[in-house]
A protein has these predicted regions:
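Asp-based, Mg2+/Mn2+-dependent phosphohydrolase catalytic module
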Residues: 1-37, 94-117, 125-162, 166-212
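Active-site neighborhood of HAD-like aspartate-dependent phosphohydrolases
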Residues: 8-79
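Short Lys/Arg-rich amphipathic alpha-helical segments
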Residues: 55, 65, 76-81, 91, ...
Length: 212
C-alpha cells in the first residue's frame, strides 16, 4: 500500500492505466482498512454540462458541497472517480482535467468541504488521440479506479459506497463488491443499490450505514 509520501504532491500523478490528482497535499492513511465514498463527478457533484474540460463550466450541484462536508466531519474518506473520455477524443487535455479538479477543490474549500483523492480515466477505445485510444480497466464500469482508491486511501471496498448518475457507476460498484447509490428518477432494482434524487438526499442514508 502506498504511503502519503509515496503519493507525492499535487496536482497530478500518473498511474498504469489511469490518472490521479490530489486535492490535499498529503492524505492521512488509516492503519486498518475503512469504508470510503467514491463519487462520480459530473451529474453528482457538478452539473453535467457535457465534457466539462474548463473551469468556467464547473457548477456545483445544490447541496453537494454540504454533503461532502458532512462526510468529512464523519472522517469518511472521499474520492472522485470520473471517466474523462474527452481527453481521448481530443476535446481537452489532461492538464485541463487537473485544472478543473483544482478549481473544484477550491470551490469545495469555500464550503468547508474537501475531496481526499481525485481519480480519472482519460482512455476510450474510440479516441482520436493515439496515446489514449484504447480500452482500460480504469474506465468505469471497470474496477481500476476503485482499486486505485482502495490502495491510496486504505479502503475496505466491501464496506464502501459508490455514488453516481450512470449505470457505469453501478457497474464499478458491483465489480468490486461495494454498495451503490444511483442518482436518478428511475430506481434501479438491483442488489445493494439504492436510488436518490441527489447526493444531498443520499448523504444521511450513507452516513447512517457507514456508522453502523
Amino acid at each position: 500500500m502506498a504511503t502519503p509520501a509515496e503519493l507525492g504532491p499535487p496536482p497530478s500523478r500518473s498511474l498504469p492505466g489511469g490518472w490521479t490528482g490530489h486535492a490535499q497535499p498529503y492524505i492521512a492513511v488509516a492503519a486498518a482498512p475503512r469504508p470510503g465514498i467514491l463519487l462520480d463527478r459530473d451529474g453528482t457533484i457538478i452539473v453535467d454540462h457535457g465534457y466539462v474540460g474548463s473551469v468556467d463550466r464547473v457548477e456545483l450541484i445544490d447541496g453537494a458541497a454540504e454533503a461532502i462536508a458532512e462526510f468529512n466531519r464523519r472522517h469518511i474518506p472521499v474520492a472522485v472517480v470520473t471517466n474523462q473520455s474527452g481527453v481521448a477524443r481530443g476535446m481537452y487535455g489532461a492538464n485541463d482535467v487537473d485544472k478543473v479538479h483544482q478549481h473544484l477543490a477550491r470551490l469545495l474549500t469555500t464550503n468547508q468541504a474537501r475531496i481526499d483523492l481525485f481519480l480519472y480515466c482519460p482512455y476510450h477505445p474510440e479516441g482520436v488521440v493515439k496515446r489514449f485510444a484504447r480500452p482500460s480497466s480504469y474506465r468505469k464500469p471497470g474496477p481500476g479506479m476503485a482499486k486505485a482508491a482502495e490502495a491510496a486511501l486504505n479502503l475496505d471496498l466491501a464496506a464502501s459506497w459508490v455514488v453516481g448518475d450512470r449505470h457505469e457507476d453501478i457497474g464499478m460498484a458491483e465489480a468490486v463488491g461495494a454498495s451503490a447509490i444511483y442518482l436518478g428518477s428511475d430506481p434501479l432494482k438491483r442488489p445493494r443499490v439504492w436510488s436518490f434524487p441527489s447526493l444531498a438526499a443520499a448523504a444521511p442514508f450513507i452516513v447512517e450505514r457507514v456508522a453502523r
